Amino acid sequence: MPLRDYNAAVDFVDRNVAEGRGGKIAFIDPQRSLSYGELRDAVARVGPMLARLGVEQENRIALVLKDTVDFPILFWGAIRAGIVPVLLNTRLTADQYRYLLEDSRSRVVFASSEFLPVIEEAAADLPHLRTIIAVGDAPAPTLQLANLLATEQEGGAPAATCADDIAYWQYSSGTTGMPKGVMHVHSSPRVMAENAGRRIGYREDDVVFSAAKLFFAYGLGNAMFCPMGIGATSVLYPERPTADSVFDTLRLHQPTLLFAVPTLYAAMLADPRSRTETLPDRLRLCVSAGEPLPAQVGLNWRNRFGHDIVNGVGSTEMGHLFLTNLPHAVEYGTSGVPVDGYRLRLVGDRGQDVADDEIGELLVSGGSSAAGYWNQRDKTRTTFVGEWTRTGDKYHRRADGVYTYCGRTDDIFKVSGIWVSPFEIEQALMSHAKVLEAAVIPAEDTDGLIKPKAFIVLASRGDIDPGALFDELKEHVKSAIGPWKYPRWIQIMDDLPKTSSGKLQRYLLREMTLGGIEATESAPSEPALYGRVVAGNGR
């Protein structure tokens, strides 16, 4: 554990230089690379620059940045100066940014050039905000990061911070409600780097590529904390990743570790290039998190590329991965075992511990737990209970300690008096060759009884026989997981509703169903809550 007097930036940046890695490449983006020594020099100049802008220790600055080498410069530069970077999603609307900037009371916003118009709209007349700085080219009189840093001839000394000082914020994406500012302390990155780093097996000579972005907790741990914790190299990709761009990046940089979300792995398998493309010879491990990995995606990946995908679980509140498959013992359909350094519990509705082979809410204890939510005392007390952090996820634990995801606490429902996991039905549907994605919710039949309803995205579009497809999928699910769990209705969608971080928004599907919205062939394709009812009568 870090000492009481501790600055995370000194540990992750200065230490690498002191240990002889000053000339080693820390980050690579499409435009340039940055050695650990160059990173240290740039990071040291950020504090004096922020001071000239009127930002004081413990103030907050907002980062709305693409994944380029400027991200670690500003992130660690602020932390080194005792200033708190607030990492914001780059895919939001002006109203959403305004809420986050008001809530965080950020003094300065650093935004990649293409985001300036929406940030300027969001920031109009905000009382706490002093200025907006462009990262990249921008027309006068907009201030530019490169020019401001160039005027700083000498770096400043690191701030006198302690391990329990707030280091950075991220906002929980959530699937409902307003985002919450999750506050992490200076000691948290080191805990994440050591715990998750050991489980994944990071090495100093690794080249890491994370398709998950740095503003996400998953991406921040993958591409920043874990590789920097051991002195490895990260490849950054600034644009939104696609199957094509990931294949290109793998071919160009030949990484040893690949991190992505299940949706991207599925998209890569569905892309025509997957039939001819090979993975880099030196690629050692593929990791998935951000949402549960469907077993069929993992199996298809193994069959096509000869690599397993390690399924991992983390959260914004815990910072990074706390539960994963063991890299040498992947078991698809499960979430694996706790990462060393974390303890897990399953509890029932009254907070009592549940036995093996029962379903309960997952609680986590570990040194990377957030300090709480900003200005959300009631929600902080509900989520952070003593040493335990409530995840809101339902899990099943076997006697051998292996955990399996069952859904969110408000997703589980009973059919014929038996608890049903929507995720289990979704996995069964996605194991069928014609189904790319699936979401399952409870719906009432004509007798008022609860039955599963499925929404699916087809693997390939074209003419279908609705009745035949429904019968085919129904029998497939019944044979896979049980005769009472099959969906009584199936609806085809162009896309499933998701948050900007890729999490499925089942509540929107529930609202549509409860609202009595009947989708038809003539319904609009946007928003994505309309599609074709394939078949089903609730029986």
From Swiss-Prot:
Field pH dependence: Optimum pH is above 9.
Free-text description of this protein's post-translational modifications in UniProt: The N-terminus is blocked.
Record keywords, A-Z: ATP-binding, Ligase, Nucleotide-binding
EC number: 6.2.1.25, 6.2.1.27
Keyword Ligase on entry: yes
GO molecular function: 4-hydroxybenzoate-CoA ligase activity; ATP binding; benzoate-CoA ligase activity
EC class name: ligase
One GO process term, biological-process aspect: secondary metabolite biosynthetic process
InterPro entries linked to this entry: AMP-bd_C (IPR025110), AMP-bd_C_sf (IPR045851), AMP-dep_synth/lig_dom (IPR000873), Benz_CoA_lig (IPR011957)
Pfam families hit by this protein: AMP-binding (PF00501), AMP-binding_C (PF13193)
Catalytic function, reaction form: 4-hydroxybenzoate + ATP + CoA = 4-hydroxybenzoyl-CoA + AMP + diphosphate; benzoate + ATP + CoA = benzoyl-CoA + AMP + diphosphate
Biological role stated in the UniProt entry: Catalyzes the ligation of 4-hydroxybenzoate, benzoate or cyclohex-1,4-dienecarboxylate and CoA at the expense of ATP. The enzyme shows low activity towards cyclo-2,5-dienecarboxylate, 4-fluorobenzoate, 4-chlorobenzoate and 2-methoxybenzoate.
Family label: Belongs to the ATP-dependent AMP-binding enzyme family. Benzoate-CoA ligase subfamily.
Assembly information from the UniProt record: Homodimer.
Identification of the protein by name: 4-hydroxybenzoate--CoA/benzoate--CoA ligase
